[in-house]
Every structure is written in C-alpha cells, then in structure tokens.
Curated annotation (Swiss-Prot):
Its main location: cytoplasm. Transmembrane segments: none annotated. SUPFAM superfamilies: Class I glutamine amidotransferase-like (SSF52317). Its EC number is 6.3.5.3, 3.5.1.2. Part of the FGAM synthase complex composed of 1 PurL, 1 PurQ and 2 PurS subunits. The lineage of its organism: Bacteria, Bacillati, Bacillota, Bacilli, Bacillales. It is found in: Cytoplasm. It catalyses: N(2)-formyl-N(1)-(5-phospho-beta-D-ribosyl)glycinamide + L-glutamine + ATP + H2O = 2-formamido-N(1)-(5-O-phospho-beta-D-ribosyl)acetamidine + L-glutamate + ADP + phosphate + H(+); L-glutamine + H2O = L-glutamate + NH4(+). This is Phosphoribosylformylglycinamidine synthase subunit PurQ. Coiled coil: none annotated. Pathway: Purine metabolism; IMP biosynthesis via de novo pathway; 5-amino-1-(5-phospho-D-ribosyl)imidazole from N(2)-formyl-N(1)-(5-phospho-D-ribosyl)glycinamide: step 1/2. Residues 2-226 form the Glutamine amidotransferase type-1 domain.
Amino acid sequence: MKFAVIQFPGSNCDLDMLHAIRDSLGEEAEYVWHAETSLAGFDAVLLPGGFSYGDYLRTGAIAKFSSIMPEVLRFAEMGKPVLGVCNGFQILTEIGLLPGALIRNNNLHFICKTVPLRVANADTMFTGLYEEGEIIQVPVAHGEGNYYCDDETLLKLKDNNQIVFTYDSVNPNGSRADIAGIVNERGNVLGMMPHPERAVEDIIGGTDGLRLFESVVKAWKEEQVNA
C-alpha cells in the first residue's frame, strides 16, 4: 500500500508521518509537495500537522487553495482513505470534506501532552483494529484544536456515528461533545487533532496510534481481495 504525505510550507509533522508509515508500519510512503497536481499511484492520502502557511488568516485557510487540493477532493470522492491530523484536520474542514471548524483552545494556550482517547466508533476503515469504548493514549500538540459545530451538525454527527474519537476524563481544549476526531458520512475521510503518528513505538511512549494505520492497511487489503 502506498501513502502520500502532503507537504505544505510550514508543515512540521511530515517526517513523523513518513517515519510511521515506512519504519513502523512497513508500507510505502512518499512526500507530495502542495504545488503538485496528481496523486496517481497512491492508495491513501495523509495531511500532516504543523502550521501550513504560518496559519495566516486562520489555520488551513491558505492551504485550501493549494494546487494539490482538487486532487485530494477527487481522491476522497473515489472513496479512498484520507487522514488529516492536527493542521490536516483543520485543512479538511476548510475544504469542506468534514463539517465544523477548529478554533482556539478554550484556555488560550498551546497544549502539548499525551491524552486519553475513547474509541467511539470502531467500525471504520481507520479503527477496525480497536475495540469500541477502548481507551488509548495519543499525544496532542495544538493551539487551535477546539472543535466547534452548530447543534444541527452535532446531532447529525451523532446520528450518523461519525464521531470516531472523544477525549476521555479531561477535555483539553473545550471541543464540543469532547470530540477529538470525526469521519465524513462515507467513512473514508478522518480528521483528528491527536497525533497517531507519534504513538507508533514503545520507546517513545506507546503504540496505540499504530493500530490506526494498520486498520487502514487491513481495510485496503480486504477491498483488493473483494474487488
């Protein structure tokens, strides 16, 4: 399976993402510069964390207009897996692949620590190797990770089982309904603020994030068999 790691000016988690896929997961991964216009040959797209375009205007607002974005939209429309982490999640909301928005943390401080997450939906291509209700430990590092949506959108997310991860015990940023990660209605686009790529090795704190990537590979292989 081959993963595309999209790089923007200001990305700083792209190397972490590449390392997670190549070295921990054992799959192919390549960088794709934001000015490219093709994702041919790739099976999954990863939008990493960082500060694309310096977070000017607002997080993800300028990345929305990058040349690669029409191809990311087409990729998602084809049903292929798209994962946006931290700034990548913010970008996914800006381009309309996911509802809602990410705003300033309610304490107005940058947060960098490992937090407990509850797996709210284990029936997605990203969470198939987790158990529903399982508590996992994944790092966060953000200043604008406070997920916001209106009441109608929140109800829809709940009704469609689109809330995939929630913060457990303590909500670090004020996100509505403790939301840490959501999928689109089709289930092939996941946005999350915590960093699974930073939880893929025991030596740096655990491997709870690795199963997310393993789940994607498992779902992809099953699709190839059934194709």
